[in-house]
Amino acid sequence: AWSINPQSAEVNNNYGWYLCNTLGRVSESLTRFDIALSDATYPSPFVAYYNKGICTARLGQYAQGEALLKQSIAANPQFVPANKELARLKMNEGQASSADSYFRIYQSQVNQMSADDLLLGWQISQRMGQMQEAAEYEMQLRANFPYSDELKQMTTGH
């Protein structure tokens, strides 16, 4: 796809995510998202803002990552995953109360929580000292995803 249309917004967004999420080449990925976002005809810029926000936060640039995730929501208020990633960003930044607020918004928007959702909810609850809520997330994770990497991470810390 790249060799056919190297300026394609969709191709650049997808390649940027591949660089960031699969290869760990986070800094390099940001240029690809910028190319995608520079295309005024790109029908889903909210996805590029979302991806760039996650990758920027992985560089420890939390304020910029937060701004990008909020741009994702502004571009498409129905794009539910952005609130989850804002919760994760705030958690990684050490702001558990803000993480909890974003996670509750996210939780109200989804029908069923994934293993990753439950782990994040558990982490936030633990950090907030909400042990009953943390136990509920753990119970759901054990019941619904007994062989998941997320449960392993919860129980072993790895």
Regions found by a protein language model. Name each.
Residues 23-35, 59-71, 94-101, 132-136:
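Structural signature of tandem alpha-helical TPR/SEL1-like repeats
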Residues 105-158:
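Terminal, low-structured helical/coil segments at or just beyond the last alpha-helical repeat
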Residues 14-15, 51, 85, 120:
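Canonical tetratricopeptide repeat
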Residues 4-5, 39-41, 75, 108-110, ...:
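Structural marker of alpha-solenoid helical repeat scaffolds
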Residues 1, 35-38, 71-72, 105-107, ...:
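Canonical positions in the second alpha-helix
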